[in-house]
Every structure is written in C-alpha cells, then in structure tokens.
C-alpha cells in the first residue's frame, strides 16, 4: 500500500511538472520575460525581478534603479495588490506618470491571467546582489567615462572575448532631470539646440517632402507631426493619428510623390491616405497586413522601409525572447521543409517569423521571408544611393559585459545572421550548443560591430537636401549617424550617445566615431537616451531623445 501511495505521488509530481503552462505563464513568457525574471534571487534585467511581487511595496527591490515616479509612489505607500497591479498594467503611465514601463496590457483577461501567474511566484526570496558592485566589466573599454566627440572605435570580429568573461549585470539606468544648462557635447564647429521638447517617449522620426517631421509614440498609440517655420525650432506640434496599437515604424509611399503614410503597429501594418502638408489623418486607416506573426510579445518594435523602386516593403520583426531557449531542438516540420517556407536559419515555436526581416509587395500581398537571425533589427533603412537594405541590431544579453557586440550591417536576401544559435559569424551561443551545427558556416559576419549592449535603435544616411542652408561638411556625406539608446545589461554603463559610422562607397568600413555624448551623469543616472536620428530639410541632424522627451538639433556653427 505504501509503495502504491509513493508511486501515485511520483506520478502526480511528474504530471504537474509536464503540465501545459497556464495562460498567465504563457503570456508572461511571450510578453514580459525579456525584461523581468521571476526567480527567487530577484535577478534584474531591464526591469526588476517580479518574484513575490503580489503584495510587495512598489519600488522595493534593493539595488534596482527605479524611476523617481515609482520610488515616490512606493514611499507614499503604493503596494502591488492584485487590484493595484491590474490598474497599473492597464495603463502604466496613467497610473504612475513618469514610470519607465513602456506599454500596458489592454485586455482584462490577459491582465487577470498574468497577475494570477505572478501570484504563484512567491516564497522565500534570496538577497539580490548589487549589479554594479558584482558585475564589473573586464576593462574600461566602451565605458561612458571614456566618451567624447571624436573618439574612434573599431571592434574586430576576430578579437571577441569568451562568453561569461564577466558577470551579467542587471543595471538599468535611473532617468534624472537634465541639470540646468546641461547640453549634449558635439564636435568643434557644430552647435546643438532644442528643436522640440515635452514630447514624451517619441521614436523614429520621418521627414516629409515639405520638411514636416513625423514621430511615433508607442505608449500613447499615436503619431505626431512637428513643423518649423525657420528650421531652428518646431512651432507646430499636431497629433496626426490616435488609436493605434504600439505604433513604431513609418514610411511614406511612393517616395517621390507620397500618397500614403504607412504605420507599423505591433502586429499589423496600416496606411493613411496622405497629401504633402497634412497635419491630421484623413479618416480611418486601411489595414495592409492584418497579422504580422502569431506572437507579438518580447521585442515589440516593427520597422518599415521600401525598396528604392518602391515595389517591395520590408518589415523587421524582433525576437519574442532573449535567446529562444524554449523552442526545442527541431521545428514542427522536417528542417528542409521548414526552411523552404521560412528561410535559412528561421526559428520556430514562439519565434516563428520573429528575429527576421519579411518582405511584401507595397499592398501587403506576396508575403515572403527575406533574411533571418537578426535578433532585433530596430533600425532599418534602404540606402538612398545603393538601394541596399541595412539593419542596426540589438544583440542578445546575459553573456557578459562585452559580448556579443551589437552591430550595423547590410542585409542580403536569403542570408542568416546568427540568432539564436550563433553570433558575429561562427561563434556558437553556449546556451544552445550543438543544436544547429549546419548553420555554423552559413552565419554572416556583420559589417560594423558596436560596443556590446549599446542598443542601436535608429539610423540615417547623411545626405543633405539640395541647397540646404545648414548642410554638414562634405566629409560627412554618405556616412551613417546611429543613435545608441544605452545599456542595462552591463556593469559599467555604455551608449547614450550618437555615433558616426564610416562608409566607403556605400559600405561600412568597420569603424565608428563618437559624435554626440554627455548624457550620462554617473553609473546610475542618465538625463537623456538617444533613440533615433533624421536629417532635417535644412541639413541639420535631428536626434530624438525619448528619455528627456526632446528632439535635439545639431548644425554646423556657420550656415552655408
């Protein structure tokens, strides 16, 4: 009888271990796990650990750099009851204005499910370790303290360090107010000023033929237009469209005489009829792509670019997870059959058609794979001269302070760029060892490597419009400006700047140079986070800073 009871208990435990995950766990894995853990150590990623979060006081995890807004809410007694979590998750910035939580959960059933799951993640917590104290980088290379305009960088693929050479830090920035009189540092011969401010968390500027600047605001679900009479400062700020679902990438089509503004939502693409000079959308949008992928969590930015001839629409889709640890060793179909449908190196499971660039006709039809293995191609452009597609990629986390590098690269049709099994060529991720040896020699080495964990979300090829009064010197023509949003997975902060990527005949040389720096106050505090760049109609460079809610304008000290 005793043996029967023990056997029954063992079977029960086995069944529980193999049970399908709850809806809340599935939602958490697909939407939250890229930024939060639920382990008893309260390990931090971009966000704080959520073990024991239900019933916990707000901003209570030691050593995590909470925003002032959330810290004050916790000091005032805010506690994460189920009810408080429901209110917060519905609209984080409405509940706690100034929080860094970028998006909410609009579906009440999904909120209830994920809160129920978080309530099960409770027990005896381990003491969290201070990231900055325990996770020092192997050297000072790439540290914010070394940054200044003009500094050169060249990271070589043949000189990468080994995985886990340093601890993996959860060291997100604490956003501070810009000190009075503080301005970004730019090279001699340039000036910097404020083009627009009080914008919230805007991203990805797009210049219209008349010089208007479109901005996407994912958290608000809206598109905003900036207009300037003299080019120095925006004097008109107009909400173009609202009611969108985490809008990010935008494109005007066709480029020479635009008829539509395309907008990439988190899981669809829509377009608005457009005439040059429109400050408000003309009616409701037309859906061009009804569903981008089966999963939409994890990396939620979607970027659009059109081929030079306007016939192909490229759409970048970031990964659902950090490194696809849960998808298993084989796709649901024979590998050859899977890759015939989704392309060489295509992942599966929750990562199906993720970490990829997809291609469509301009009307959203004729869907096809273009390239795979690009973990999060946030910045995506078509080179205005060569017509080649470029991506700036946020690479994976938790391999150490200086591995792997982020990068910018030309993207070729049918090619594989490494994620999740490899990085920067034939370097195998030790967490996925031995799963895809067939891809080792098929993995493309990117063109220019960027300091690890810099987070490069937006870029532009510098080409001054004809007759531009504030055109940069000729030596800048054809180079790429790249925004580095800044690190969280590094013991000593890096990024938070704009760099110049050197080009030769439309091809990156491998070198880049600091161009705009000075937004980091300490290893804890920053007052700005460059998110994207655009060339204004007068030739000035506009830098969208979604940390400070500012668009900066950089121009030569002397106009042409």
Segments (PLM) and residue ranges:
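Beta-propeller domain segments
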Residues: 134-188, 258, 319-368, 375-518, ...
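Surface loop/turn motifs at the tips and blade-to-blade linkers of beta-strand repeat domains
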Residues: 194-199, 239-245, 288-296, 369-373, ...
């Amino acid at each position: 009888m005793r043996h029967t009871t023990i056997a029954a208990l063992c079977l029960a435990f086995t069944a529980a271990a193999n049970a399908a995950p709850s809806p809340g766990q599935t939602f958490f894995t697909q939407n939250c796990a890229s930024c939060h853990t639920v382990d008893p150590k309260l390990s931090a990623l971009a966000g704080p650990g959520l073990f024991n979060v239900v019933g916990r006081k707000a901003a209570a995890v030691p050593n995590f750099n909470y925003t002032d807004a959330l810290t004050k809410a916790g000091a005032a007694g805010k506690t994460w009851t189920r009810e408080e979590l429901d209110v917060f998750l519905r609209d984080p910035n409405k509940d706690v204005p100034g929080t860094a939580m970028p998006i909410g959960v609009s579906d009440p059933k999904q909120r209830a499910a994920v809160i129920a799951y978080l309530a099960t993640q409770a027990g005896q917590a381990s003491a969290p370790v201070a990231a900055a104290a325990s996770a020092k980088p192997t050297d000072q290379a790439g540290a914010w303290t070394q940054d200044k305009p003009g500094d050169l960088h060249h990271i070589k693929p043949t000189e990468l360090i080994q995985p886990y050479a340093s601890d993996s830090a959860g060291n997100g920035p604490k956003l501070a107010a810009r000190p009075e009189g503080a301005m970004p540092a730019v090279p001699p011969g340039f000036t910097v000023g404020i083009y627009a401010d009080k914008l919230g968390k805007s991203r990805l500027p797009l210049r219209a033929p008349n010089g208007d600047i479109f901005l996407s605001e994912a958290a608000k679900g809206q598109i905003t237009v900036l207009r300037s009479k003299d080019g120095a400062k925006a004097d008109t700020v107009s909400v173009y469209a609202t009611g969108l679902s985490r809008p990010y990438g935008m494109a005007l089509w066709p480029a020479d005489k635009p008829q539509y503004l395309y907008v990439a939502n988190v899981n669809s693409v829509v377009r608005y009829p457009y005439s040059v000079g429109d400050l408000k959308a003309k009616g409701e949008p037309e859906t061009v792509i009804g569903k981008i992928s089966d999963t939409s969590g994890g990396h939620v930015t979607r970027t659009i670019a059109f081929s030079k001839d306007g016939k192909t629409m490229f759409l970048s889709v970031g990964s659902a997870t950090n490194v696809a640890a849960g998808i298993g060793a084989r796709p649901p179909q024979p590998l050859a059959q899977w890759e015939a449908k989704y392309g060489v190196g295509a992942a599966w499971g929750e990562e199906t058609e993720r970490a990829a660039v997809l291609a469509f006709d301009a009307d959203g039809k004729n869907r096809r794979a273009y390239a795979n293995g690009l973990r999060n191609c946030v910045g995506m452009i078509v080179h205005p001269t060569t017509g080649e597609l470029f991506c700036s990629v946020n690479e994976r986390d938790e391999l150490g302070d200086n591995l792997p590098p982020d990068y910018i690269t030309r993207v070729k049709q049918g090619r594989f760029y490494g994620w999740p099994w490899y990085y920067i060529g034939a370097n195998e991720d030790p967490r996925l060892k031995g799963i895809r040896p067939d891809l080792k020699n098929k993995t493309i080495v990117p063109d220019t490597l960027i300091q690890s964990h810099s987070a490069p979300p937006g870029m532009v090829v510098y080409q001054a419009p004809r007759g531009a009064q504030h055109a940069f010197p000729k030596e800048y023509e054809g180079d790429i400006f790249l925004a580095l949003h800044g690190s969280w997975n590094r013991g000593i902060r890096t990024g938070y700047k704009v760099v110049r990527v050197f080009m030769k005949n439309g091809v990156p040389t491998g070198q880049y140079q600091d161009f705009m720096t000075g937004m980091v106050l300490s290893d804890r505090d920053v007052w700005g986070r460059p998110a994207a760049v655009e060339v204004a109609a007068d030739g000035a460079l506009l830098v969208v800073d979604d940390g400070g809610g500012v668009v900066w304008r950089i121009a030569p000290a002397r106009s042409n």
